[in-house]
Regions:
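Glycine-rich phosphate-binding loop signature in dinucleotide/nucleotide-binding domains
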Residues: 9-11, 97-99, 150-156
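Substrate-recognition "cap/lid" segment bordering the active-site pocket of phosphatases
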Residues: 104-158, 165-166
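A generic "structured core" feature
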Residues: 25, 80-84, 115-119, 123, ...
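Surface-exposed amphipathic alpha-helices with a cationic face
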Residues: 88-96, 147, 168, 172
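Active-site neighborhood of HAD-like aspartate-dependent phosphohydrolases
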Residues: 1-60
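Short, basic/glycine-rich phosphate-binding loops at helix/coil junctions
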Residues: 61-73, 123-126
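Short, acidic loop-to-helix structural element flanking the phosphoryl-transfer center
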Residues: 3-4, 12, 72-103, 140
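Acidic, Mg2+-coordinating phosphoryl-transfer loop and its flanking beta/alpha structural elements
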Residues: 156-183
Length: 183
């Protein structure tokens, strides 16, 4: 990551919108751990689809996603993943400069994932996930809603993420700046 202080100061940034998965922590290995932990669910979902049809499958998937998949993800993040030092440095620098911060994730359980990473959620003015907005990244409409929740002007906002095609496109869609976190 480029020197955070110079990025924030050069562009007179007043707000930062951080992606969570892949940005605040390195998510490599998480997908494999999820498959190993949840392998037993796959035959159940396939059998249920054949037996009950699409309506029941949608209900099962929603329940499974909220009560099995996401809690498993939070547990694995807490056990095997750590915050990126450069992300912690960025958060600290934003706090020092009085820059408003939001965490905007394509997935749910934002507060729970932050807790699993031992990152204090109270440092952020806004915690939001795409499902609660009803729109996934790179939706400019969703990014605009995040800016509204944060009370931030796009030209004074820096989006930080690990995927240019999602996080970067969302930032550009509202006229905000973007900083790519690379492995």
């Amino acid at each position: 990551m480029r020197d955070v202080k110079s990025v924030l100061n050069a562009d007179k940034i007043e707000a930062v919108v951080l992606d969570l998965d892949g940005t605040l922590y390195d998510k490599r290995g998480l997908a494999g751990r999820m498959v190993r932990r949840l392998w037993w669910c796959l035959p159940l979902l396939a059998a249920d689809r054949m037996a009950r049809g699409q309506f029941w499958l949608a209900i099962v998937r929603t329940h499974w996603h909220r009560h099995v998949y996401l809690p498993t993800m939070v547990d694995l993040i807490g056990k095997f993943h750590h915050p990126r030092p450069e992300a912690l440095h960025l958060i600290e620098e934003c706090k020092k400069q009085g820059i408003k911060m939001a965490v905007y994730s394509d997935y749910g359980c934002v507060a729970e994932k932050l807790a699993a990473l031992h990152i204090d959620a109270s440092q952020f003015e806004v915690l939001v996930d795409a499902p609660s907005l009803g729109l996934l990244k790179p939706s400019a409409k969703a990014a605009q809603r995040v800016l509204e929740m944060l009370g931030a002007a796009p030209q004074k906002t820096l989006f930080v993420g690990d995927r240019d095609e999602k996080d970067g496109k969302a930032a550009r869609g509202v006229g905000a700046k973007f900083l790519l976190i690379e492995d």
